[in-house]
Structures are given as C-alpha cells and as structure tokens.
Curated annotation (Swiss-Prot):
<feature type="binding site">
    <location>
        <position position="75"/>
    </location>
    <ligand>
        <name>an acyl-CoA</name>
    </ligand>
</feature>
<feature type="domain" description="ACB">
    <location>
        <begin position="3"/>
        <end position="88"/>
    </location>
</feature>
<dbReference type="Pfam" id="PF00887">
    <property type="entry name" value="ACBP"/>
</dbReference>
<keyword id="KW-0813">Transport</keyword>
<dbReference type="InterPro" id="IPR014352">
    <property type="entry name" value="FERM/acyl-CoA-bd_prot_sf"/>
</dbReference>
<feature type="binding site">
    <location>
        <position position="56"/>
    </location>
    <ligand>
        <name>an acyl-CoA</name>
    </ligand>
</feature>
<dbReference type="InterPro" id="IPR022408">
    <property type="entry name" value="Acyl-CoA-binding_prot_CS"/>
</dbReference>
<dbReference type="InterPro" id="IPR000582">
    <property type="entry name" value="Acyl-CoA-binding_protein"/>
</dbReference>
<dbReference type="InterPro" id="IPR035984">
    <property type="entry name" value="Acyl-CoA-binding_sf"/>
</dbReference>
<comment type="similarity">
    <text>Belongs to the ACBP family.</text>
</comment>
<dbReference type="GO" id="GO:0000062">
    <property type="term" value="F:fatty-acyl-CoA binding"/>
</dbReference>
<feature type="binding site">
    <location>
        <begin position="30"/>
        <end position="34"/>
    </location>
    <ligand>
        <name>an acyl-CoA</name>
    </ligand>
</feature>
<comment type="function">
    <text>Binds medium- and long-chain acyl-CoA esters with very high affinity and may function as an intracellular carrier of acyl-CoA esters.</text>
</comment>
<protein>
    <recommendedName>
        <fullName>Acyl-CoA-binding protein</fullName>
    </recommendedName>
</protein>
<keyword id="KW-0446">Lipid-binding</keyword>
Length: 92
C-alpha cells in the first residue's frame, strides 16, 4: 500500500474513534491534513472574533514547510497514536 492510500485509510479511521480526541489533537490532525492535501496555507489569518477558524489556521500554519509526504506520514503516526490510546483505555 502506498503512502497516499495509507493516509486516506487513516483519515477514515480517525472518523471512527469512539472517544473524541482533544482539541489539541484535532488541531494537529487538521493542520497535517490540510498541509498534506492542499499544501502551504495561502489565506490570511482570520480575525480575532473567528476563534475557531483562527485556531485551525494557526494549526495549518504550524506545519508549513513540511512536504506532502512528511505531512501524510506525521498524520498517519498521530492517528495510530490515538487509536492505540483508545485501545489501551478500552482494555483498562
């Protein structure tokens, strides 16, 4: 399986987590996903009254400079960590 297919598979797996990841983890995933699928952020930073959009923009901007492959690989790693954490908490 290629990196792109593995990335797409993990993008689907994250939707099936039974426990919602923390906001921090969601923002990390968002930034990596956008960097992997769109590339560098090209829009201006949202205003301070759009806190949710601003946080998402900041998460995307934080991974600026990563290649598509790096972003995909980091995304896969993060999803695997979340899946492992969920599995260990379910068996505890």
């Amino acid at each position: 399986m290629g990196l792109k297919e593995d990335f797409e598979e993990h993008a689907e797996k994250v939707k099936k987590l039974t426990a919602s990841p923390s906001n921090e983890d969601l923002l990390i995933l968002y930034g990596l996903y956008k960097q992997a699928t769109v590339g560098p952020v090209t829009t201006s930073r949202p205003g301070m009254f759009s806190m949710k959009e601003r946080a998402k923009w900041d998460a995307w901007k934080a991974v600026e400079g990563k290649s598509t492959d790096e972003a995909m690989s980091d995304y896969i790693t993060k999803v695997k960590q979340l899946l492992e954490a969920e599995a260990s908490s379910a068996s505890a």
